[in-house]
């Protein structure tokens, strides 16, 4: 039997508000959550049966500049973070912002092996961005895997044709940035 080991587990999220259309799924495990960050914190707490040991939330008037970091301690160290946007007057934080913020705040160093687990629909884009940011800039080896659609429960309705088209667009934009 093989075992996966990790020096840390990090939940990456955003400060995007939870939509009413998502409540039927999110209320099953995070009834009072208001952001993706809250959802990720509740998920980590439930899955790993842990409590926060420290939390820092940097609030600003512009929601796109807000960032948050929750620490859970233990081994492996568990962290949840939400990054601020690098262009807060234009947009909320994107995947690249989040990878850069994680690299900066968690002192990830260089040359690490990183496994990213995400929804299947997001694998191509997140892998490209991880290679571009974490691989090319910091020498990390990155592998991105996606869990099956059926694991998404009530959230599988967010995987419509429009969602796939948006992801295809994002993949093409990310590929262009690699050139």
Predicted regions and their residues:
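A structural signal for short, hydrophobic/glycine-enriched beta-strand patches
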Residues: 1-159
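Long, compositionally biased charged/polar accessory segments in the mid-to-C-terminal portions
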Residues: 154-179
């Amino acid at each position: 039997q093989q075992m996966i080991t990790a020096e840390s587990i990090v939940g990456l999220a955003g400060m995007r508000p939870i939509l009413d259309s998502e409540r039927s799924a999110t209320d099953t495990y995070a009834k009072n959550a208001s952001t993706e960050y809250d959802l990720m914190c509740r998920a980590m707490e439930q899955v790993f049966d842990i409590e926060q040991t420290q939390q820092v939330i940097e609030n600003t008037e512009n929601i796109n500049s807000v960032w948050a970091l929750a620490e859970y301690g233990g081994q492996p160290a568990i962290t949840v973070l939400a990054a601020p946007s690098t262009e807060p007057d234009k947009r909320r934080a994107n995947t690249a912002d989040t990878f850069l913020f994680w690299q900066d705040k968690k002192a990830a160093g260089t040359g690490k092996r990183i496994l990213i687990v995400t929804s299947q629909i997001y694998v191509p884009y997140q892998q490209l961005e991880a290679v571009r940011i974490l691989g090319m800039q910091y020498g990390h080896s990155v592998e991105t895997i996606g869990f099956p659609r059926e694991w998404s429960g009530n959230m599988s309705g967010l995987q419509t044709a429009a969602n796939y088209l948006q992801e295809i667009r994002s993949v093409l934009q990310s590929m262009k940035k690699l050139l």
